[in-house]
Amino acid sequence: MADIDNKRRALVTGGSGDLGGAICRRLAAAGAQVIVHANGNLARAQAVAAEIAAAGGSAQAVAFDVADGEATAAALDGLLADGPIQIVVNNAGVHDDAPMAGMDAARWRRVIDVSLHGFFHVTQPLLLPMARTRWGRIVSVSSVAAVLGNRGQTNYAAAKAALHGASKSLAREMASRGISVNVVAPGVIEGRMAGDAFPPELIRQTVPAARAGRPEEVAALVAFLCSDDAGYINGQVIGINGGMG
C-alpha cells in the first residue's frame, strides 16, 4: 500500500456510499486525514467517519449538495479554515436513466449538475490553496459508460465524459504546481447502484472477467493515484473494468 503523509487532508465527495466509503477507508489506512462527504444524508457520512476512527484513522463527516454552488462554497470555506485540502476525490454522482427520446430536461440536468457542475463547484475553490502548498492530487471517478457509451445513459455518459476533458485540461494547468489530475473509469462495481441494473447473468455476458469489480479494487487505484508514488501520472483516464474496454 502506498503511504500518504498524515498531514494531508483528503475530501471524498459521495464518501458515504459503497464506492466512496471504500475510498475513504483506503485513504485513511494510507495515512490521510479524510473528510467524508454526503450529498444529503449526514448520518451515513458520520457512520463511515466513525468506522475509520475506530480503526485508528482520522476522519470527519460533512454534508452539502455539490450541485448547489453557493452551499458548496460555504461548506468549503469552513473546511479551508482548518488548512488546505490537498487531495480531492470527485466521486459524487447519480443515475437517472432513460432512453434520450423519452428523457426530459430535468432528468438530463440532474445528472450533469451533480457529476459535472459538482466537479467544478468542489474543485475550483480548492485549487489556489492547494497550489500554494506545491502538492496536490485530484482524482475524479467516471465510468466505462463515458468511454463506450451505454443505452439509456446519454446524460450519465455525457457528464462523465466531460470530466475526462476537464481533467486533462486541468492537469495541464496545474502540473507545474505539483498537482496531478486524473480520472478513474470503473466498469460494473458491486454495490447498491449496480445491484439491480446488472444481474449475474448480464455481468457474465458483458464483462470479460465474468464478475463485478469490488469497491476495494477501485479504492486501491484511487489511493495509489493520491500518493507520492503516482506524481508523474497526470492527465490520464484509467479504466478498471474487468476487460470491458
Regions found by a protein language model. Name each.
Residues 16-17:
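Conserved glycine-rich cofactor-binding loop
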Residues 42, 63-74, 105, 216-217:
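The beta1-alpha1 cofactor-binding region of Rossmann-like NAD(H)/NADP(H)-dependent oxidoreductases
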Residues 99-100, 107-112, 203:
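Substrate-binding pocket helix/loop in short-chain dehydrogenase/reductase
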Residues 120, 127, 135, 214-240:
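C-terminal substrate-recognition "lid" of short-chain dehydrogenase/reductases
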Residues 123, 159, 167:
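Active-site helix of classical SDR
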Residues 143:
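Residue(s) in the substrate-gating loop at a strand-loop-helix junction
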Residues 175, 180, 233-235:
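Short, small/polar-rich loop/turn modules that mediate ligand/substrate recognition or access, typified
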